[in-house]
């Protein structure tokens, strides 16, 4: 049973970005996920299968072209966020594809453009835009296969290196968010997390999902592993088959998740709506239903198909009502 402590106070904020310190009594910050609906922000990628068919010279030229394009696209994404007053941006997990291949071609290209990457990171801080990441579904730290666990760690190492090259802090301010993975493997999950490299663990967060782990289970893992929990209200109602975002357990788990954040002002949550029905796991185009408790959320990633259009719509009917 989860114990809710509503008397919890915020920790000292001296080491936080100045903008984070100024959030008291502010409206929630709504975040853009990876790309824009109007195609202004679109990243390029390459599959492993196609890559392996290329010669070494072709691999290098192809990856260099993709990386430089995506670097410019990341710059454009920050510009878009600035122009649309968005202070939260989720970076694409495919920003620099295949940079962890054994031939080290992608890795070497990243080193070559490291100065430009650092400038992007500096720009995000100058614009007061928080950048976060959600690695793909292949990250399964709770797997009973040692090979899958090692592959998962390798993926996280790739993303952590990108964040380091961007100069982003090794803290949940620049979080890398994953799901629990294989069900009924909580102890394995805790064990693997405890042994992760510092540049991964210092940024790692866990999110409740709609299939394998209940919100309470992920909360308990986060407490034991001493990492923050990203609460997803839609996953909660899907997993528990609830009929309202304002079910008491939604607010209870929102507050429980807040307990896992050393700095509650950094707490980040997700929102999506069902496409065809309230409990539909597929994301809708817009957000037309919000948990009342989310008015107390500092940071909200908007997971809707129409991206910035959904954010503008949400601002018009929800934030304006605060």
Swiss-Prot record:
Protein name: UV DNA damage endonuclease
Gene symbol of the encoding locus: uvsE
Any one Gene Ontology molecular-function term assigned to this protein's record: endonuclease activity
Enzyme class: hydrolase
Record bears the keyword DNA damage: yes
Protein EC: 3.-.-.-
Function field: Component in a DNA repair pathway. Removal of UV LIGHT damaged nucleotides. Recognizes pyrimidine dimers and cleave a phosphodiester bond immediately 5' to the lesion.
Pfam family, one: UvdE
Alphabetical list of NCBIfam families matching this protein: PRK02308.1-4, uvde
Protein family membership: Belongs to the uve1/UvsE family.
Keyword Nucleotide-binding in record: no
One GO term (biological process): pyrimidine dimer repair
Domain of life from the UniProt record: Bacteria
Alphabetical UniProt keywords: DNA damage, DNA excision, DNA repair, Endonuclease, Hydrolase, Nuclease
């Amino acid at each position: 049973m989860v114990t809710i402590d509503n008397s919890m106070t915020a920790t000292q904020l001296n080491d936080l970005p100045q903008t984070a310190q100024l959030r008291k009594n502010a409206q929630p910050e709504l975040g853009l996920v990876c790309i824009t609906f109007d195609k202004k922000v679109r990243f390029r990628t390459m599959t492993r299968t196609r890559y392996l068919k290329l010669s070494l010279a072709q691999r290098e030229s192809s990856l260099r072209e993709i990386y430089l394009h995506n670097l410019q696209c990341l710059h454009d994404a920050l510009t878009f966020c600035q122009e649309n007053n968005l202070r939260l941006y989720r970076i694409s997990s495919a920003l620099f594809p295949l940079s962890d291949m054994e031939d080290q071609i992608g890795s070497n290209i990243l080193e070559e453009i490291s100065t430009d990457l650092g400038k992007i990171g500096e720009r995000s801080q100058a614009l007061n835009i928080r950048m976060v990441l959600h690695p793909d579904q292949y990250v399964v730290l709770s797997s009973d296969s040692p090979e899958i666990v090692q592959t998962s760690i390798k993926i996280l190492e790739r993303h952590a290196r990108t964040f380091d090259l961007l100069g982003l802090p090794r803290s949940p301010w620049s979080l890398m968010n994953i799901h629990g993975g294989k069900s009924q493997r909580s102890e394995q999950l805790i064990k693997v997390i405890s042994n992760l490299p510092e540049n991964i663990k210092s940024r790692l967060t866990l999110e409740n999902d709609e299939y394998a782990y209940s919100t309470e289970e992920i909360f308990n893992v986060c407490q034991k592993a001493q990492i923050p929990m990203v609460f997803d209200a839609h996953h909660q109602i899907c997993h528990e088959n609830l009929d309202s975002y304002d079910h008491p357990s939604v607010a209870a788990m929102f507050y429980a998740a807040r307990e896992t954040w050393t700095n509650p002002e950094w707490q980040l949550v997700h929102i999506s709506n069902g496409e065809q029905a309230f409990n539909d796991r597929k994301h809708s185009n817009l957000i037309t239903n919000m948990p009342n408790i989310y008015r107390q959320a500092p940071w909200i990633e908007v997971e809707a198909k129409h991206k910035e259009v959904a954010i503008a719509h949400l601002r018009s009917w929800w934030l304006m009502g605060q």
